[in-house]
Amino acid sequence: MSAELKGKTAIVTGASRGIGKALACTAASLGINVAIAARQEGPLKETAAEIEKQYKVKTLAVPCDVTKLEDLENLVNKTKEKFGQIDILINNAGVSSQYPFEKQPIEDFEKLAHTNYLGYVRLIRLVINDMIERKSGAIINMVSGSTLCDPLPRSFIVYSSLKMGLRAFSKALFWEMRDRGIKVTSLLPGVTDTDLTGKLDEITADASRLMSTKAIEDAVRFALTVPANVCPLEIAVINQQTPWTKPVIPYKQEHPEK
């Protein structure tokens, strides 16, 4: 537990399972109270109860669809009502979609954009003015290791392009906020063993090509515990065997009819 972080408050989105749950636990292990958000209320409340029991911190479970501005506003308001202020934001909610571009449903574009980009930007906008006033705060954005590839991975170009936009935004925000006491860090993880990647065909054929969430937990722990005058701009955590090192990912199993 970090004495400097004990009693602070973090919002973690997409936190009922997978990477988000792991990151909420990481924050709690540092003595940070956590407001966790996800769409499904049942698993969210279960996760909150687990965290309180294991880490002896305060939690708040807020059902939230990050594509809806009113849900984001409710998340921020309820967190401030319970904890007083928001010290840390871990933007993690995300969706993926694997299609060759010419076969990708057009309705996917808006869902991906609102979840993986606008949801992040809007939530940051809702919390950042209080951070600016206090001259203190930390924002961690879940980007993607796919943004390190050139060209972007085949069948993920819309997803990866939006993550590229998020990476650029996050980097620009770092420079805009660095003299105001606010840290902004981007995480660029490789393909991680979660239920989200379980839907991807070739990637999950060999478990050695997947990372565990522990590597990302360690990256977040590092970002939160470096000295006050230091901020990691980007942290790339890539499995040595990750498929993102190859520009082409075969597309075959899940949509053979397309």
Predicted regions and their residues:
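Residue(s) in the substrate-gating loop at a strand-loop-helix junction
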Residues: S144
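Conserved glycine-rich cofactor-binding loop
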Residues: S16-R17
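Active-site helix of classical SDR
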Residues: I124, S160-L162
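The beta1-alpha1 cofactor-binding region of Rossmann-like NAD(H)/NADP(H)-dependent oxidoreductases
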Residues: G42, P63-N74, I106
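Conserved glycine-rich Rossmann-like NAD(P)H-binding loop of the short-chain dehydrogenase/reductase
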Residues: L30-E46
